[in-house]
């Protein structure tokens, strides 16, 4: 399997990487977006540029759909992309209080470090406890982890019909703004602009 990171620095190289992955008969390919650790400008991708990128990558995936490589749609903005194309539909029988997919931070994953430290997400500094001092059950159900489950606090996503299925990447948003609940900087969906 091969996974790569996409940023403004290498976005134009990804289609060639896909060609190489297929030529080398790699079994799985995926990519994730770069999470800046400061307010870097050189790596930024504009929202519509990212949407156009996903369109080009989707066409590549379709071109190679029978090649034997599984293309993992890891980035949660694929949900928005597929929704706009009519390839993802919100199921009729869904519970308004249930998170079905999208970012799993605080929901169904955590990162355990060799020091025993537990992070809500591996992609940004999000300490929620330490296994050497607390039981994992208490960490998972604790106040610090619950802070990441406040879906109504998402400044843009909380008003989007895809809230329970997407939420973009809050770690990327955090890398740009130091606010976990800020709008995903590559999300192109137009929502009432008064979300800040």
Mark where each language-model region is.
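Radical SAM enzyme [4Fe-4S]-AdoMet core and its adjacent flexible, acidic
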Residues: 1-106, 111-123, 127
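Flexible mid-to-C-terminal extensions adjoining Fe-S/redox cofactors in radical SAM and related proteins
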Residues: 118, 122-196
């Amino acid at each position: 399997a091969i996974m790569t990171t996409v940023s403004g620095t290498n976005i134009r190289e990804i289609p060639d990487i896909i060609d190489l992955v297929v030529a080398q008969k790699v079994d799985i390919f995926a990519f994730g977006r770069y999470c800046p650790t400061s307010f870097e400008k050189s790596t930024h991708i504009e929202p519509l540029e990212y949407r156009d990128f996903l369109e080009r990558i989707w066409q590549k995936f379709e071109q190679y759909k029978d090649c034997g490589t599984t293309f993992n749609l890891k980035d949660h903005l694929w949900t928005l992309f597929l929704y706009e194309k009519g390839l993802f539909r919100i199921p009729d029988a869904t519970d308004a209080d249930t998170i079905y997919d999208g970012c799993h931070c605080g929901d169904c994953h955590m990162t355990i470090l060799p020091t025993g430290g537990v992070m809500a997400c591996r992609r940004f500094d999000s300490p929620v406890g330490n296994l050497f001092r607390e039981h994992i059950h208490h960490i998972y159900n604790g106040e610090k982890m619950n802070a990441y489950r406040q879906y109504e606090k998402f400044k843009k996503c909380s008003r989007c019909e895809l809230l329970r299925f997407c939420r973009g990447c809050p770690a990327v948003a955090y890398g740009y703004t130091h606010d976990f609940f800020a709008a995903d900087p590559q999300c192109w969906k137009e929502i009432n602009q008064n979300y800040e």
